[in-house]
């Protein structure tokens, strides 16, 4: 049931979500906490949650559907981070760190998708 917990992709996505949640809750302006802040939190949550849901599915097609949704949500996170930097809600150093975190999730997630595709 909890097959996702051993996956590096999920572990890193879970860590990324916590960072994004704290950043959006603590650093974004009050007016943005319910706009961009909410969006980045939801997208970050979706990355990890879709891995969980995908790994709970029985068919490879369903697993791939949710893993692909996770990958798309990760792209959304990357764009939200870009917007946060453009609006000066985060520093350049924070931006670079978050982009690196996104890449740390992307690499094992794409490997997981490729491996799942090969089993089907």
Question: Across the structure, where does each feature detected by a protein language model lie?
Answer:
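Amphipathic alpha-helical assembly/interaction segments
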Residues: 1-120
């Amino acid at each position: 049931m909890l097959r996702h917990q051993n996956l590096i992709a999920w572990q890193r996505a879970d860590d990324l979500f916590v960072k994004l949640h704290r950043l959006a809750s603590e650093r974004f302006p009050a007016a943005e906490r319910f706009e961009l802040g909410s969006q980045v939190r939801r997208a970050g949550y979706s990355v990890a949650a879709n891995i969980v849901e995908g790994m709970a599915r029985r068919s490879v097609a369903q697993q791939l559907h949710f893993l692909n949704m996770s990958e798309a949500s990760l792209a959304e996170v990357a764009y939200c981070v870009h917007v946060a930097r453009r609006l000066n809600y985060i520093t350049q150093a924070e931006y670079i760190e978050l982009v690196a975190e996104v890449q740390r999730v992307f690499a094992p997630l794409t490997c997981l998708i490729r491996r799942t595709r090969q089993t089907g």
